[in-house]
Amino acid sequence: MIVIDIPAQTLAFEGRSYLVSTSKKGPGEKNGSLCTPRGRHIVRAKIGAGQPLNAVFVRRRPTGEVWTPELHEEHAGRDWILTRILWLSGCEPGRNRLGEVDTMRRYIYIHGSPDTAEMGKPGSIGCIRMRNRDIVELFDRVPPYAPVQINA
């Protein structure tokens, strides 16, 4: 099971612990809140196998771009989703599944981030950001439909 600890800004899986960055708006489930959802989830989809480190994704598809500081400057303000995506789906109807609280419909992912993104401090708009090498390691070890617990 993947365990994400929002206050500690960590993700743990099979004896490994990684620094992450969750929402700068804190925990929450409502659609449009830009918060990181809590509770039981699963990895509904794994996206990006075989893509290079820093591959850029838009709407879960690789753009063919590879993130660089120069590309970052050209697209200031872009929410960078890089390298790999683990798309989460809630398992608790009314809390993080269905209706106005559906994690999957909110497009909440565990994903790679630019090297300039600070880990260990909230900074995302809902997703769980990781270092690119860390998300590749996690992606390769996590099976589809793996359980995920997000605690606040």
Segments and roles (model prediction):
Residues 1, 21-33, 65-72:
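N-terminal post-signal-peptidase region of extra-cytosolic proteins
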Residues 3-12, 144:
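A short, compositionally biased
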Residues 6-8, 15, 38, 81-83, ...:
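Extracytoplasmic
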Residues 7-9, 23-25, 46-48, 89-91, ...:
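Solvent-exposed coil/turn segments that connect beta secondary-structure elements
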Residues 12, 28-29, 51-54:
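Short, solvent-exposed loop/turn elements at domain surfaces
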Residues 15-23, 41-45:
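Short, surface-exposed loop motifs enriched in S/T, G, D/E and P with embedded aromatic residues
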Residues 28-47:
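Short, surface-exposed secondary-structure junctions/capping segments
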Residues 53-152:
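Exported/periplasmic cell-wall-interacting domains
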